Amino acid sequence: MKVRWLVNENFPAPSVAIMRASGHDVLSIAESHSGDDDVEVLALARKEGRWLVTFDQDYGELLFARHYAPPPAVILLRVPSYRPEEPAVWLEHLLCKPNGLLGKFTVFTGTTVRSRPLLHQSAT
């Protein structure tokens, strides 16, 4: 499965470069849509069929409390301290089971991975 990524503005540029060098299709909000709010980022991920990767916990509220329509998958990275290259390594590790992430909101803490199904509802 070829994943198309949308990495949020808070995703480190060195990890974007590593992922692209490994052949991944990565759209970086910091490079092309800087300043877009979370709702716009979510809509872009959904429109382009990209998996959203973020360090921003607000997406959980948008998807589960406010019922915005989800993209194919969301990966929330909740690691308090890391080197800028590490997120690319984490995503490679998570891709070992990509079908286990599809249709899910996944939280990666550095030591644990938790997923819950995304609720496919109409956009708010």
Listing of model-derived features with the role each one plays in the protein:
Residues 16-17, 38, 62-65, 86, ...:
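Short glycine-/acidic-enriched loop or helix-start segments at secondary-structure transitions
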Residues 60-94:
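Mid-chain, well-packed structural core segment of small domains
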Residues 19-22, 41-42, 66-69, 90, ...:
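Short, glycine/charged-enriched secondary-structure capping and boundary segments
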Residues 3, 98-124:
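Charged phosphate-binding loop/patch that engages nucleotide di/tri-phosphates or the phosphate backbone
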Residues 27, 53, 75-77, 106:
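Hydrophobic/aromatic beta-strand patches that form the interior of the parallel beta-sheet core
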Residues 45-63:
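Acidic, metal-binding active-site segment of PIN/NYN-like and related structure-specific nucleases
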Residues 2-50:
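N-terminal first-folded block
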